[in-house]
Structure formats: C-alpha cells, structure tokens
Amino acid sequence: MTRGPIFLNVGISYGLPRTKLPAAVSFRKWVAATLQGRIRKADLAIRIVDEKEGRALNYHYRNKDYATNVLSFPAQLPEPLPKALKIPLLGDIVMCAPVIAREAAEQGKSLSAHYAHLTVHGTLHLLGWNHEDHQEADAMEQLEREILANLGISDPYLEEY
C-alpha cells in the first residue's frame, strides 16, 4: 500500500452540455479516493459523452451495439517507461451521461452517487481490476463498496438504495 499525498492530473472533457453533471472537482475526489493507498501519482482522462458517441465507442472497442455506462481504456505504455514521463499515465474513462442518468433513476440512486460509483469502477479497471468471473467480480465489488463507504456513499449493489 502506498501512503502519502497523491499527485493527480485528471483531465475532463465533455461531449455534450454540462447540465446535471457533477463538477470536475467531484470526479477528481472520486479518482483520488480510488487511488489512495494504491498509487501516488497518476494522469488520466475522463470524457462524458452522449448516447451516440457512447454507442459508437462500445461498438468499436467491444463489438456491442449499444451505449454502456462506463468504458475504461488502460494506457498501453512501452517498457521501460520513458524518463520524461514524470507522472504515470493510467488511461481514459468514458462515461455515457444519458445511460448513467437512466440507470440512476431506475435504481433509485442519486445521480451523484451513481457517477461516483462508476468513476471508482472505471478507475479500478485502469488499475487492472476486472470482473470476468464471479471471484474477480466479488473482489472488485467489495473494493468499490469500501472506497464508496469512505466517501460516505451507500453500497451501490444493494437492491434498495
């Protein structure tokens, strides 16, 4: 476990109007909570997209013809890392605002809590976590619960939120 201050560069871009979206500072807080104790320096990008862009990306990269809530693209860096790279590049997270809003409403969650959960989820993917089988999924979900609890956010996997 890595302790100490985190140096974090989170670039956020929007592919749609920013209405009803969390502030950039919120995304940075959620990423920092995920990285705490795991990594001290990181550079990543978060892009908030509409359904059309979300669907196109999901089709292009996963061959699934629908928009999904979050996609993570871990950075593919050469080994050894270039000396000029002072902050490790983690990768990119793409979040589809209409899907996230729809899911939050269907699940009775606050929009902010759902964005927090999916930001944590996407960041964990950038760190190498997956949910390809039940064991991996259980471990990842437990870690998400712990991180979100530290942020004061309820268990996102409860049936009633």
Curated annotation (Swiss-Prot):
Keyword match rRNA processing: yes
UniProt GO cellular component terms: cytoplasm
GO-annotated biological processes: rRNA processing
Free-text remark on how the cofactor is bound: Binds 1 zinc ion.
Binding site for Zn(2+): H121, H125, H131
Classification via SUPFAM superfamilies: Metalloproteases ('zincins'), catalytic domain (SSF55486)
Transmembrane segments: none
PROSITE patterns linked: UPF0054
EC category: hydrolase
Main location: cytoplasm
Localization of this protein: Cytoplasm
Cofactor: Zn(2+)
Keyword Nuclease among UniProt keywords: yes
Similarity comment text for this entry: Belongs to the endoribonuclease YbeY family.
Protein name: Endoribonuclease YbeY
Species assigned in the record: Xylella fastidiosa (strain 9a5c)
